[in-house]
């Protein structure tokens, strides 16, 4: 019983530390050359199939330079398709062109969550650059 209690306390401490770390991460950072990096972890909680799908979005001069998927709990088999087939389509697009990218068949929920995260990143960028 005592071991179970200690394990529960350790679990709670881990969750509390993770939440504190989330709060410390800046949503947007400005780099040299007018490059902005937006972390959508706290901006958008739209779930894919299993979990939120946060992104790190790099924007320069109102164009997406790159999009990187951050850790999530999506099914690896399906999310691999997202990272290999969908996410690369956004690089080089103007912000207003992102909505035109179609979701992937067979991974629609995750695709839509990625697009929602991109939209949240765009809105934050426009409001705070």
Predicted regions and their residues:
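Hydrophobic h-region of N-terminal signal peptides that target proteins for export
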Residues: 10-17
């Amino acid at each position: 019983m005592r071991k179970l209690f200690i394990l529960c306390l350790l679990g709670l401490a881990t969750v509390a530390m993770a939440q504190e770390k989330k709060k410390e991460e800046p949503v947007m950072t400005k780099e040299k050359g007018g490059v902005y990096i937006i972390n959508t972890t706290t901006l958008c909680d739209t779930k894919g199939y299993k979990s939120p799908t946060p992104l790190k979005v790099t924007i320069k001069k109102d164009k997406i330079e790159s999009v990187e998927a951050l850790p999530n709990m999506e099914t690896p088999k399906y999310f691999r398709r997202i990272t290999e087939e969908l996410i690369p389509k956004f690089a080089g697009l103007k912000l207003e062109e992102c909505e035109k990218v179609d979701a992937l068949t067979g991974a629609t929920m995750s695709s839509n969550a990625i697009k929602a995260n991109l939209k949240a990143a765009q809105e934050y960028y426009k409001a705070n650059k």
